[in-house]
A protein has these predicted regions:
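Phosphate/diphosphate ligand-binding glycine-rich loop within oxidoreductases
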Residues: 57-178, 336
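Positively charged, low-complexity intrinsically disordered leader regions
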Residues: 1-77, 81
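A short helix->loop->beta-strand "cap" motif at the edges of active sites that frequently abuts
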Residues: 148-155, 221, 320-329
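Short, conserved loop/helix-junction motifs that constitute active-site signature segments
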Residues: 186-188, 217, 316-325, 352-353
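Glycine-rich phosphate/diphosphate-binding loop of Rossmann-like nucleotide-binding domains
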Residues: 69-81, 178-292
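Rossmann-like adenosine-cofactor binding region
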Residues: 243-347
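Adenosine-phosphate binding glycine-rich loop
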Residues: 321-399
Length: 399
């Protein structure tokens, strides 16, 4: 067997992830340490095989269904790529063109679209208290449908971003970090600064910063959450980060100083997000149909944002990081000064210097999603990876 693939299989052999089989992937903190760590070697193995022209199709037919309730480029194409890598066709559910627009229930829709579906990926991140709840409702509906004999199989649900977490993004970020620092074992004690940064828009989801502090604190890292006063994230996610840090020997601290967060940081992740309290209020206003209230809130939040234009990832701040060479992360697209906006999250020179690593960071997401699906659909991942290599079907046939 190929030595590199054997290395990935050996990593899996040391982990207990049996509960992932026939499961879903909602929040990273729902998973055990071993379950999270299993995703990484599977993602690496799938990537390695594709790079070496080995087909990784475990399905001869089947659907991967995507539902995006917010705009998406990277995650939309990553989900489609992941499904295709494993042999699934992708069908995007357009709610506006379905019977959902005419009052069809979640239970009915979930079952009607899932007769031949093996996975459902959902992005629902815009309204606090809604996205994760909706994803769970869909998962419960198809589980019951399978139990009742309506569905031949239970589709796996993958969270492509909700109001609480963005696991496919944060796991891709983590795999990028693991490769950058040479292994999971080298992350303990590394300082990561998850910092708010200015954006001319006001309503960016909380799920990325929440996902980052909820995941990175699992690996013994020193996680710093920095933001201006009033830009707090969900308190329950902060509690998750605190508990993780206490368990792993790392730390979780908060500051209202971007400079303090950047000082001696090994990794920086400057990104805008909307205040938790404001997003809660926004959700309630939409529920009440209060158009005037929504406009007033938008005006208030834009003015609040404008008071913090100095929260920008600059060359000067980057010089204060560990040896002036911190790894710069972003989920993309970034608000780049004098490129995508006048004032934004990052100076153009900083972004340009890290452009290639940023694109590589994004490139892990299709494989992370594929690994999540693989672990949910394959009872013996190690044996299946070995069989795929032994089968030796070329992904791209050439004479």
């Amino acid at each position: 067997m190929d030595a590199t693939l054997q290395k990935y299989i050996d990593k899996l052999n040391a982990l207990n992830f049996k509960e992932m089989y026939e499961g879903d992937f909602f929040l990273t903190w729902d998973k055990s340490d071993d379950e999270l760590e299993a995703v990484f070697p599977v993602a690496d193995a799938l990537r390695y095989m594709r790079e070496n022209n080995i087909s990784t199709k475990i399905f001869e037919s089947g659907l991967g269904i995507s539902l995006f309730r917010d705009n998406s480029t990277r995650t939309r194409f990553s989900f489609a790529s992941a499904c295709n890598l494993l042999g699934l066709e992708v069908q995007d559910l357009d709610e506006g063109k379905s019977q959902i627009a005419h009052g069809e229930t979640v239970r009915e829709t979930a079952n009607m679209i899932s007769f031949m579906a093996d996975v459902i990926g959902i992005r629902d991140d815009m309204y606090i208290g809604k996205g994760h709840t909706y994803q769970k409702e869909v998962a419960e509906a198809v589980t019951q449908g399978h139990k009742d004999g309506v569905l031949e199989q239970k589709p796996t649900l993958v969270n492509l971003q909700c109001d609480i977490d963005h696991p496919t993004q944060c796991m891709a970020d983590m795999l990028h970090i693991i490769h950058h620092f040479g292994g999971v074992e080298n992350l303990k004690g590394k300082k990561i600064a998850m910092t708010w940064a200015y954006s001319p828009s006001y309503g960016k989801p909380l799920s990325v910063p929440q996902g980052v502090i909820g995941l990175m604190s699992r690996f013994g890292m020193d996680v710093v959450l920095a933001h201006p006063e009033g830009y707090e994230v969900m308190p329950e996610v902060e509690e998750v980060a605190k508990a993780n840090a206490a368990k792993t020997g790392g730390s979780f601290t908060k500051t209202n100083s971007m400079a303090e967060a950047f000082k001696d940081a090994d990794i920086v992740y400057p990104k805008s997000w909307a205040p938790f309290a404001a997003m809660e209020k926004r959700t309630n206003l939409y529920a009440e149909g209060d158009a005037d209230g929504i406009k007033a809130l938008e005006k208030e939040l834009l003015a609040q944002n404008a008071d913090h234009k100095d929260w920008c990832c600059t060359e000067e701040l980057m010089k204060t990081t560990k040896d002036g060479k911190a790894l710069y992360l972003h989920c993309l697209p970034a608000d780049i000064n004098d490129v995508s906006c006048k004032d934004g999250e990052v100076e153009a020179s900083v972004f340009d210097r890290y452009r290639t690593p940023l694109y590589k960071e994004a490139s892990y997401k299709p494989y992370i999603i594929a690994a999540m699906i693989f672990l949910a659909k394959v009872k013996d991942p190690q044996a299946t990876l070995k069989a795929l290599e032994e089968r030796g079907i070329a992904r791209w046939f050439q004479k």
